[in-house]
Amino acid sequence: MRVTQGTFSFLPDLTNDQIRKQIQYAINKGWALSVEYTDDPHPRNSYWEMWGLPLFDVKDPAAIMFEVEACRKEKSNYYIKLLAFDSTKGVESTAMSFMVNRPAHEPGFVLRRIESNDRVQRYQIHSYATEKPEGERY
């Protein structure tokens, strides 16, 4: 099952050239970029690990691609995304985020039905990947 999170998530994976163009777009807008990774693909997992520090004031797409490639090399079986932050209003908020790497095999999710009081049905999404310890999921 293909995880769909962020901009361009329903499109085929971006090529390095397309990623560079998106980086240039973010730089032209004055956004700061950062690289994050995780092995827990749950849709509500918004706390991914940061790869280094955010790349404030970096104006060269090659420098950001260098960080993306370094993260891909070390975390090749992880989900990796590139985030662009817009701080024009004084409060940083994500303006764009998209995946730049994903594991070779994505096991998907199970939907569990849970009975609550008064026969109320509740549902829970659980990633098959999280059944293994962190760092050994893919």
From Swiss-Prot:
The keyword Lipid metabolism does not apply. Keywords: Calvin cycle, Carbon dioxide fixation, Chloroplast, Photorespiration, Photosynthesis, Plastid. The keyword Amino-acid biosynthesis does not apply. InterPro entries: RuBisCO_ssu, RuBisCO_ssu_dom, RuBisCO_ssu_sf. It is found in: Plastid, Chloroplast. One of its GO terms (biological process) is reductive pentose-phosphate cycle. One of its GO terms (molecular function) is ribulose-bisphosphate carboxylase activity. GO terms for cellular component: chloroplast. Heterohexadecamer of 8 large and 8 small subunits. In this alga, in contrast to plants, the small subunit is encoded in the chloroplast. The basic functional RuBisCO is composed of a large chain homodimer in a 'head-to-tail' conformation. In form I RuBisCO this homodimer is arranged in a barrel-like tetramer with the small subunits forming a tetrameric 'cap' on each end of the 'barrel'. HAMAP family: RuBisCO_S_bact (MF_00859). RuBisCO catalyzes two reactions: the carboxylation of D-ribulose 1,5-bisphosphate, the primary event in carbon dioxide fixation, as well as the oxidative fragmentation of the pentose substrate in the photorespiration process. Both reactions occur simultaneously and in competition at the same active site. Although the small subunit is not catalytic it is essential for maximal activity. Belongs to the RuBisCO small chain family. This is Ribulose bisphosphate carboxylase small subunit. It comes from Cyanidium caldarium (Red alga). The lineage of its organism: Eukaryota, Rhodophyta, Bangiophyceae, Cyanidiales, Cyanidiaceae. The gene is rbcS.
